[in-house]
Amino acid sequence: MSASSDSAKLAGLNKLIISYPQSKLVGDAYGAQFSVLMSLHRDSAAFFAAHNYLAAKDSQSLPGALHNVAMELAFRRQYPDSALILVDSAISLYREKHGRLAPVLLHTRAMSLFLLKRFAEAELTQREAITLLPASAIFDPRYSNYFAQLGMIQLETHPGVEGLEQYVHASFISSQPSVEYANLDSLFHSRVKDSTSVVRVRDSLFERTANEYLHNFTDTSRAKSFIAESFSRNRVFTGRALQFAREAYREAAMRSLQERCDAAASLGIVLSNAGHNGEAEKFLVEALQTALPSATELFLALGSVQESLGKKNEAFTTYLAGVVVSRPSVLMKPLQALQKELYPHASIDSMITVALRRWVDFFPEKYQRPDSLDGQPNQKTVLAELFTGSECRPCQAADIAYNKLLERYDRAELAVLEYHLHIPRPDPMANTDTELRSEYYGVNSTPTSIIDGTNVINSGGLGIAARAKFAVYADAVDHSLTTPAKASVKISAKILRSKVSFVVSASVTNARKSYKLRVVLAEDGIRYQGANGISEHRFVVRKMIRGAGGTSFNQNGKVTVKDAFAVSTIEDQLENYLTTYEEKMQKPGTLFKEKKSEIDPKQLYIVAFVQDDATHRILESTIVKVKR
């Protein structure tokens, strides 16, 4: 950050403190002020801000605040004695409150001890911090700095290569090495007496770490991609890096789109590091299908490759896509340089705003049945089920993506059902059957998407991630559409004077006891806006007719479900469920801002599907609009 931007930030913080002295934010404003003042080397003013920051904290938040100040001092390598006093106070308060230690507190303490040249004590403290990390931390990039710091300390306490082993380990697992261990060659030359042995010793340590990593993961394809990127980034075994990356890409060919794109990104990055820019571009572009704006390394690699190939406009678009949420300097710098050359009179902020809209407002292509499937009997209708919640912010991307699926596919190709759940807070479109259906699949988080009963796709995101989620969902649907239907389902449904009547008949060959026909009443286009900002909800499950358990087939592999009911009956059931739920939560009449029990008869659909309860596989599904 530049001195001018630091000064501007400082002015803004001062204004907040002066204008709103009673605000709860004032304490944190002093904390931010402390950090900025330290970067400006205004130490006296910084310590005054730190004092006010700590004074504003209650007993609950004081340990964290003490640690924040200590960490700022220690990792700026300033005032280590003060840092040690502060972090020791934080440790004492934290242990008193929680009865245990936190690894991050010990990590900061070890750094303070190191700066005070109390190396033996620093090593013991850092080792203790590492023992408190999760078991998976040894190969988790988020914890690489713990191993790097141990290596830094050991270089002072051990004459051999023990410290180098920790540096290599940290450099291997980290996606973005810190300054502490970026230049390994100079460290090896300072420790290995025989200069001719430097490369051999360095490579042997990397190879050993890679072998340990490979043996710790059952998914060898993903492991190979990780190792390939690490070797390439650290400039060791470049030939083997390319070999591993290509193998991982081939092995991912039959996996999900997300896995294929991850492998393509790794291969593209390795190729670009090796100077094979033409080939690298192909794989990096492929990886964009599921990329989020936070994929800085991918956008940087692709933009750099495109610039090297003389494709400046494409490079500009690539860099622009990577700065729509945050503005990482590694992307902003080349973006601004290209903007001055290509669009000198345009506003970079306006261009970023337009680029941001493209992440959410995209237009999917209509599905085209592959020629290879022509003549295939029993074309299938895929069922996509989404477990979501109107109060679930991470469900935003999944909800938008499902709406885009409905644009891509006709209802003869895809049926959609959305089950609303009380996650993380009460949802007025939830009901008994949506809860039972979530129990059937073992769903305990939202969003969860399930394609044809067996392809479970978890994780969500805000609207900015909708395009990537859509690509993953559409790939799964496309794949399911290549398999023929294993059952026949026919529906006739009508509504007369607010009474729905329907007949569903289904047949299968080689019927099993585990085969069930399930019939669902869904309502399209419910208007309601919860915390996730989605205002229209598509194909919401209102009732599973004959229960969530479904209906069994007879010995001849046939089943018919015939029923009639008043819409008001379903509305009463939904209203009673919501009222009972409020009472259960001891908030009668106040839990929901609006009870969405009223049904629009013009927007009703019957969805029926045959499912194998032994495997959850859906053999066929059908959707029809209830005719008036």
Question: Model-found features: residue ranges?
Answer:
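Short, conserved sequence motifs used for protein processing/export or organelle targeting and
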Residues: 419-628
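Residue at a conserved register position within TPR or TPR-like alpha-solenoid repeats
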Residues: 37, 73-74, 113, 154, ...
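Short solvent-exposed coil/turn linkers within tandem alpha-helical repeat scaffolds
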Residues: 16-28, 56-62, 77, 93-101, ...
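Structural register within alpha-helical repeat arrays
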Residues: 33, 69, 109, 143, ...
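Local sequence-structure signature of Cys/Sec-based thiol-disulfide redox active-site neighborhoods
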Residues: 374-414, 419
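Structural motif corresponding to the intra-repeat A-B loop/turn of tetratricopeptide repeats
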Residues: 3, 40, 76-77, 116, ...
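TPR-repeat structural position
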Residues: 6, 43-44, 80, 119, ...
